Structure formats: structure tokens, C-alpha cells
Amino acid sequence: MDISKEDILAMANNASKNTLMETLNIEICDVGVDFLMAKMPVNASVYQPDGVLHGGATVALAESVGSFAAHIFIDAQKYFVRGIEISANHLKSVSSGFVYARATFIHKGRTTQLFDIKITDEENNLVSVCKLTTITLPKD
């Protein structure tokens, strides 16, 4: 990476102001050569009616971290990233604490990117497994 880890985290979290990420309190919390990680608090604002994490909030977390991961590796002056397909398998319920999303590349193409995103709880138990496809398009 050409810029520091701290600069990437600051840029990502600053860019999420006034977005769904801010509404859901999603924070980009770690980055490495081949991954990006975010966390989201699990509380009443992301519950489904029976008091556990809503699958839609989980998918929003997954798409957020995957899209940011793609964004880090492009020239943002010339291109933008959009999610074009996402799938999720929810494996475990969570009712409190934080969930963590770790996005890693499966495919890193010029136009499309494919991510494996694992959502875990605070004890590192697997909560959901997601796949996200993003597309990089010119700003023209």
C-alpha cells in the first residue's frame, strides 16, 4: 500500500459520514494487504422483531466493507465502485455486542472484483458468509 494504514482508516471512516454506514454505526477498523475489516454494534437499531441482528443490516455491513475494499485499490479520481451482486448465508444469531466483517479478494480484476466476506461475533464465531461482486466504472 502506498498510504499508511491510519490514513486508509481515516479516509474510509470520513467518507462514510452522512451515509447508511453512519446510520448503522459501521466503522472501518482494520486493513491489510489482502483484507479490510469493519465492525457494527448489535443493538435495538439493527434488530429484527424478535431481538436479534437483522439479516438486512448484516448484508449492509458486508456490502459496505467489500465496496470500500474495492475502492481502496482504484484511482478514485477516475473511477467509482458499485456493488452489483451480493449473497448471504446467515449461520448464527447475535443479540448484543459487535459483529465484524472481514472482506478478502477472491478475484481482483480491472472491471469486476469478487469478495469473500465473513461476519463474526466478538468471540470470532461465524455469523454469516457473504459473497459480493463489485464493478469499477469510469467517472467520465
Regions found by a protein language model. Name each.
Residues 1-140:
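Terminal targeting signals and extreme-terminal segments of soluble enzymes
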